[in-house]
Amino acid sequence: MAEIFDSALRSHRDFAGVFEYDGETAYFYLYRNKNDQPGEIIGWIHIFSGTVDFDEHDISIVWDKNEETVGLFIRDQLWAAFSEPWPTKHGGNYVPGATSSVRLQFNR
């Protein structure tokens, strides 16, 4: 299976939500941007391992309207999120065909 990568940078350009599937394992990361210096991953959530049942068009990374939470949506369901205080974690463990267990107020 092909690799999948997607990200969304907050408007302040200080944090990004990043999804990465390397062909075997998928993670959702919270990345801290450091302007002209290399940034760092400050949080990670395991999404799944194994064969994927979706493609890059099914993935979206969205910041809420207050930019206090960044979420990973798979087929329009919120499967993982980071919220303030950074890096508070929610969700993970995607299961094909299942409904997400993440119950988080997410205002787009």
Model-derived segments and spans:
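Generic detector of solvent-exposed, compositionally biased contiguous segments
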Residues: M1-A8, G43-D55
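A sequence-composition feature that detects small, non-aromatic residues
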Residues: A2, A8, A16, A26, ...
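Blade-terminus and WD-like Trp-Asp/Gly-His loop motifs, strongest in beta-propeller folds
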Residues: E3-D22, V62-E67, Q105-R108
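Beta-strand C-termini and the immediately following turn/loop, strongest in propeller blades
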Residues: V18-G23, L30-N33, F73-R75
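Surface-exposed loop/turn positions within WD40 beta-propeller blades
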Residues: T25, E67, R75-Q77
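Signature of short aromatic-glycine-proline-rich micro-motifs recurring in repeat-based ectodomains
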Residues: E56-I61
